[in-house]
Structures are given as structure tokens and as C-alpha cells.
Amino acid sequence: MSESYQKLRKDFKELDFTDRLTFLAESLLLTGQSAIVGGLEVAGRVVETVTGTVGSLIDASGITNILGGSGGVVGETIDRVAITVKDVSRSAGELYNDAVRNVENATSNAAKAVGDVGVSASEAVKNIAGSFQKTTGNK
């Protein structure tokens, strides 16, 4: 095992019980966040790649210029498809960015809450231990 891991392990063992629980809870939240964000990144890339590829094919093929210039029903339909594909690509990117921001904000808030609870629990345990020592010391 590496030195940094050994040091982390030693430091963890020296923590109070409540601090250990808080550390583990925060670690779980951050691991969960990483998994969710990673999944969103993959999904966002797939949607953007597919819609971007379709949009690029429509633009590169010149179908809109050839058939769209006719002004007929086919031309209008192809124009609508091209616009829809570009809108979907833009929307997918925006939705992905919003989703990542929401996950990061929720995880950050949850981690802060866990940290606050851990601090409160740690203080409560220390206060109880201090009170116990005071009462036994007075006898």
C-alpha cells in the first residue's frame, strides 16, 4: 500500500467516532455525485453527438438547398427537420448542463448538511462526555 493511503488510514483511525461517521457520509455523497455526473456526461455526449451528426449530415448534404429551394411541401418538411434537429441538439446541451448543475448543487447542500449534523453530533458527544467527567470528578 502507498504511503499516502497508509497515512489516510492512520488519520482515519485516530478520528472520533462521530467524525468517522461524518467522513464516511460525505464520502458516499461525493461518490454518488461523481457517478450521477458521469452518467449525465455520457448521456449528454450521446445525444449531442447523434443530433449533431444528423444536423451536420443535413447541412453537408445540401438537401435543404436542393429541395428546400423548391418551396414545396418536401422542401418545407426538410427545413423543419433541420431546424428541429438543431433545436434538439441545443436543448440537449442545455438540459445536460442544467442537470449537472442541479446534481452538484444538491450534493453540495447535502454534504454541508451532513457536515453540520456531524459537527453537531460531535459537539453533543463531547458535551455529554465533558458533563460525565465533571460529575464523576466532583464525587
Swiss-Prot record:
The keyword Cell membrane does not apply. It comes from the Bacteria. Pfam families: Chlorosome_CsmC (PF11098). The keyword Coiled coil does not apply. Coiled coil: none annotated. It is found in: Chlorosome. One of its GO terms (molecular function) is bacteriochlorophyll binding. Keywords: Bacteriochlorophyll, Chlorophyll, Chlorosome, Chromophore, Photosynthesis. This is Chlorosome protein C.
